[in-house]
Amino acid sequence: DQNFPPMGFVGDDGEYTGFDLELAQEVAKRLGLEYKAQPIAWDSKDMELESGNIDCIWNGFTMTGREDDYTWTEPYMANQQVFVVANDSDINSQADLAGKIVEVQADSSAEAALKEAPELTATFKELLTTADYNTAFMDLEQGAVDAIAMDVIVAGYQIQQRNADFKILDDSLSEEEYGVGFKKGNTELRDK
């Protein structure tokens, strides 16, 4: 997903960059492997991996809830799923999301966490999905949605880069860890 800053995104120079991409490049260099950044549509990640178009998924990839679906590395980063709202909104906790429109990236960890919280989502006026978080932030800026559910790492970066008047709610939706996911059973590449 090339729209997941600061983990992976297209920089001002038009090149792919980000924490995970730089980490992957360094690991490949140290292991003597070829590094190639391959942008994919996030909701097609399983098909891309199964077809062999990509060798691994390494871009803010949440292990939690997917432990049996991939062959994983050890976790390398802790993360949370949170809600982002406008600073001037009356939303200060998850309870305040009742009757509000919430947006989330399709096939994301935040969407999975929301599916695990039906008692919360039942209170929303509407739960919308979008292809990427850049669109979600534009929707929040324009008042089309009241909140975004997303990774805290990405939320903090987006708020800082946009110099936006947003806040992250204190009560998180879920706790999780990032890892590198390989096709189920591909221990050979993982163990290099």
At which residue positions do the language-model features occur?
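Beta->alpha turn/N-cap motifs
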Residues: D1-F4, Q38-D43, G52-T64, N87, ...
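Short glycine-rich His-centered loop
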Residues: D1-G18
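Short acidic, glycine/proline-rich loop/turn micro-motifs
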Residues: G8-D12, A95-D96, D139
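Ligand-binding cleft/hinge of the Venus flytrap
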Residues: G8-D13, A24-L33, A110-A131, I159-N163
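Acidic, polar ligand-binding/catalytic clefts
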Residues: L21, Q25, K29, E34-D96, ...
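Extended ligand-binding regions for polar small-molecule ligands
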Residues: L21-R30, D88-I91, A95-I101, A106-S109, ...
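A ligand-binding cleft/hinge motif common to bilobed small-molecule-binding domains
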Residues: D43-M47, G60-D69, A113-P118, D139-E175
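Periplasmic-binding protein-like
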Residues: M77-V85, V152-D191
